[in-house]
Regions:
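Ser/Thr/Pro-rich low-complexity tracts
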Residues: 1-348
Length: 348
């Protein structure tokens, strides 16, 4: 006849939540099989053995939990070759984040952020990881069950959440960190052709971390293209325009910075007119030619002969306007072309 002793049977653990730092007493209760003396078996929470186990009776053992970070972990009791368990009995506390300091960091990253909470941030350097927004920190250093130091990655934007994960659990605090907004100190070219297509180096800081993260503007117009160079500079290819003392703006995400009065488009310059003699009755088309600055579209430039505006002005290019001469009696008139508030002239 073969005789077998009942294996351990586990029905419950005394507490369902424990600190991830461990050292919480769990009363493991079952229906026998835990032995008859000081207890030779082991108790485990999840895959980790308890730091210590004290036998109370054939149906009860007190276990001092080890550190951990699981959720819905099984509790098992082994006695000899036999064991029993109950599933989903114990969870370690999830991280709780209460504050982050400092609240501003450079868009280039590299700043140490102290993430403070109320427990649940793990039990060793490898147990907790922090994120700012959707980007993981470049490095996370565990300090205690309630604190982690995070070295921020580069980023843009304001009001980013900070989260700490420990195992499969995580906690976060919203709107905790903002990256510095762009700041523009100067533009590399103070004058650009009204036809555009000129590269303007925009210098400052806080312009993001990659090619598509920053965009430049000259006046009210976005640059034809913006090429990120560093956290402190981008190159903007100016679009066609007119006028003077335009501000230059750089935006990174929803944040922006600008400098005023940085760029002017070249004023019109007039060198010659296509007809040197015009009937006093007017009506003759005169081609007014120059070296640029005459605007960017059909309505951007206007012509004058003498003191009288042309009856009609047709824009041809950045360097030419066709003026329908007004009637008049004058000699050696001055031809004037205006584009916005700027103008150029020549004696014809």
């Amino acid at each position: 006849m073969v005789l077998s002793y009942d294996g351990p049977s586990v029905s419950s653990a005394g507490v369902s939540n424990v600190a991830c730092s461990g050292s919480v007493s769990l009363t493991v209760v079952g229906r026998g099989g835990a032995g008859t003396s000081g207890f030779s078996g082991k108790v485990r929470v999840g895959a980790t053995a308890c730091a210590g186990s004290v036998w109370r009776s054939d149906s009860g053992v007190v276990c001092r939990s080890s550190s951990g970070g699981i959720t819905d972990g099984a509790v098992s009791v082994s006695s000899g070759l036999q064991h029993g368990s109950v599933s989903r009995a114990v969870s370690y506390n999830a991280p709780v984040v209460s504050s982050v300091g400092p609240s501003n960091c450079a868009s280039s990253g590299g700043l140490s952020l102290t993430v403070v909470g109320r427990g649940g941030t793990g039990w060793s350097d490898i147990s907790a990881a922090a994120s700012v927004g959707v980007t993981g920190c470049a490095a996370s250093v565990w300090r205690s069950d309630s604190g982690v130091v995070c070295r921020s990655s580069g980023g843009i934007g304001g009001g980013a959440a900070v989260s700490v994960s420990s195992g499969v659990q995580r906690g976060s605090v919203s709107a905790a960190v903002s990256y510095d907004a762009p700041s523009v100190s100067s533009a590399g070219a103070s004058n650009v052709a009204s036809s555009g297509a000129m590269s303007v180096s925009v210098c400052g800081r806080g312009m993001g971390v990659s090619g598509p993260s920053a965009v430049g503007r000259v006046g009210g117009s976005a640059c034809a293209s913006s090429v990120w160079r560093s956290d402190s500079g981008l190159v903007c290819r100016a679009v066609a325009g007119r006028g003077r003392d335009h501000g230059v703006l750089a935006s990174a995400g929803v944040q922006r910075g600008s400098v005023s009065g940085a760029v002017s488009y070249n004023a019109p310059s007039v060198s010659s007119a296509g007809a040197s003699n015009v009937a006093s009755s007017g009506g003759l088309s005169v081609s007014v030619v120059g070296w640029g600055g005459m605007g960017v579209s059909g309505s951007s430039a206007g012509g004058r002969l003498g003191l009288t505006a042309c009856e009609g002005s047709g824009w041809v290019s950045d360097s030419a306007v066709v003026c329908k001469a007004p009637g008049g009696v004058f000699g050696g008139a001055v031809g004037v072309v205006s584009a916005g508030v700027q103008r150029g002239s020549a004696s014809l």
